[in-house]
């Protein structure tokens, strides 16, 4: 059974994309890394045991003393606790890990939104290919009609062989174009299946409609787009990471202080270095050592000093990248906004052109039927109508693409209803059905 793929469901289905799953794993990795860095605030506890148990057996011979023997079991567990009181690197490392985690989450969201936009674009393209096929089918039917009319007139003695050949050539061209559109349709289907990771057969709504309206002014587009852009946020976070890295290198010359407590114990059973072994002998001992420790790197050949300068320079570079991306986003948002307005005009003008060329074709056929026009005129009008329909299909396709692009760039949602001050019955995108 075929599943029905709805345009609105793309956002939910895209989570199956393999590339997105890969980025999700990286988010988890960054989260675990952050937890690892935060854990440095807490004490560490280590348990060691040298032989659990350990058995020693042997003999010792010396010409000046009596021979001794050893046969003994022993265990020497120790417990060590360490707490870093002053760690000059810890806070900046935690900040770096936290900012890296935010970047990983932003990267996931950036890719998710990019994939949604790309999947929607492929959906529109697949839907458009349905309309292209229907348009070329109608064109082919018109060419068949023209060919039959030319043959009929030739048989009746009022037509020419040239007109028949001309109609036949046009028919062949239209058949070839239709075949190309069908192949492109299958390619578009494969492309949509790949990005959504759909295993089963599926179908979509074939009719091409506007997916929404855009009622926001350009200033609001720019303001929201710059405030909410995740790539800009990532560059700011990268800058903070570089700053914290430079702090890390600077703090490497500061002392670290930690307190440690070591508890060691020993248990024995048996005898050691004895003339006469006593297997029932046993003993135990313990020591507890608590200390305040100090570590300070005085000189490292300038390694951390130069690394500090390097990170500061990289932070400045991120600032330039931020400003550059900001300018690019302003251009992209403004371009998309103006393209949307342009496509609105193209939709309306192409509808008017379809109406005019349809009437022109009808009149051309009537003139040809009564013998006051040529087949060439009919074929020209026929091609004009097909081109007008193609313009309308492309205009709706580009309108929907630009609408999705504006959503992606500004983080605003498209509107279901159209609000336009200069709306009138004769010429407005608001009068088109979604």
Residue ranges and their predicted role:
Residues 1, 6, 10, 391-434:
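Acidic, low-complexity, intrinsically disordered peripheral segments
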Residues 1-8, 114-228, 336-339, 343, ...:
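Periplasmic alpha-helical coiled-coil/stalk elements that build and connect Gram-negative outer-membrane
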Residues 1-50, 98, 196-245, 297-298, ...:
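Bacterial Sec-pathway N-terminal export signals of envelope proteins
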Residues 2, 48-83, 206-213, 247, ...:
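Small/polar, glycine/serine/threonine/aspartate-rich low-complexity segments that form flexible
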Residues 11-21, 28-43, 78-96, 106-113, ...:
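A glycine-/polar-enriched beta->alpha junction
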Residues 22-37, 111, 115-134, 145, ...:
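Amphipathic alpha-helical coiled-coil segments
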Residues 157, 197-198, 371, 410-412:
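Short helix-capping/hinge motifs at transmembrane helix termini and TM-loop junctions
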């Amino acid at each position: 059974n075929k599943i029905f793929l709805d345009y609105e469901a793309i956002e939910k289905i895209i989570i199956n994309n393999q590339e997105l799953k890969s980025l999700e794993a990286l988010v988890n990795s960054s989260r675990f890394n952050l937890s690892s860095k935060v854990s440095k605030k807490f004490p560490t506890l280590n348990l060691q045991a040298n032989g659990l148990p350990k058995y020693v057996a042997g003999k010792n011979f010396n010409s000046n003393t009596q021979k001794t023997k050893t046969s003994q079991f022993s265990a020497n567990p120790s417990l060590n606790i360490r707490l870093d009181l002053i760690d000059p690197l810890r806070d900046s490392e935690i900040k770096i890990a936290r900012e890296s985690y935010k970047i990983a989450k932003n990267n996931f969201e950036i890719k998710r939104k990019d994939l949604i936009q790309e999947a929607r674009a492929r959906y529109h393209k697949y839907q458009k290919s349905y309309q292209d096929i229907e348009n070329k089918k109608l064109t082919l039917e018109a060419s068949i009609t023209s060919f039959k009319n030319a043959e009929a007139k030739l048989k009746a003695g009022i037509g020419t062989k040239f007109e028949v050949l001309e109609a036949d050539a046009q028919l062949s061209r239209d058949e070839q174009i239709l075949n190309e559109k069908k192949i492109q349709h299958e390619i578009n289907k494969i492309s949509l299946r790949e990005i959504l990771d759909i295993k089963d057969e599926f179908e979509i709504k074939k009719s091409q409609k506007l997916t929404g309206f855009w009622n926001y002014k350009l200033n609001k587009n720019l303001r929201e787009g710059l405030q909410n852009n995740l790539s800009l946020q990532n560059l700011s976070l990268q800058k903070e990471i570089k700053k914290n890295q430079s702090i890390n290198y600077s703090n490497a010359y500061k002392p670290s202080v930690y307190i440690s407590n070591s508890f060691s114990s020993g248990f024995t059973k048996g005898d050691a270095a004895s003339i006469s072994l006593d297997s029932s002998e046993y003993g135990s001992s313990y020591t507890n050592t608590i200390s305040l420790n100090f570590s300070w790197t005085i000189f490292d050949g300038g390694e951390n000093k130069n690394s500090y300068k390097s990170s500061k320079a990289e932070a400045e570079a991120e600032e330039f990248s931020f400003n550059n991306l900001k300018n690019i986003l302003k251009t992209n948002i403004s371009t998309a906004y103006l393209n949307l307005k342009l496509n609105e005009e193209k939709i309306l003008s192409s509808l008017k052109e379809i109406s005019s060329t349809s009437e022109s074709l009808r009149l051309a056929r009537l003139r040809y039927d009564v013998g006051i026009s040529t087949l060439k005129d009919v074929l020209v009008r026929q091609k004009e109508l097909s081109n007008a329909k193609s313009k309308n299909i492309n205009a709706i396709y580009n309108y929907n693409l630009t609408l999705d692009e504006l959503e992606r760039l500004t983080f605003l949602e498209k509107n279901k209803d159209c609000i336009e001050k200069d709306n009138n019955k004769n010429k407005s995108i608001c009068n088109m059905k979604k």
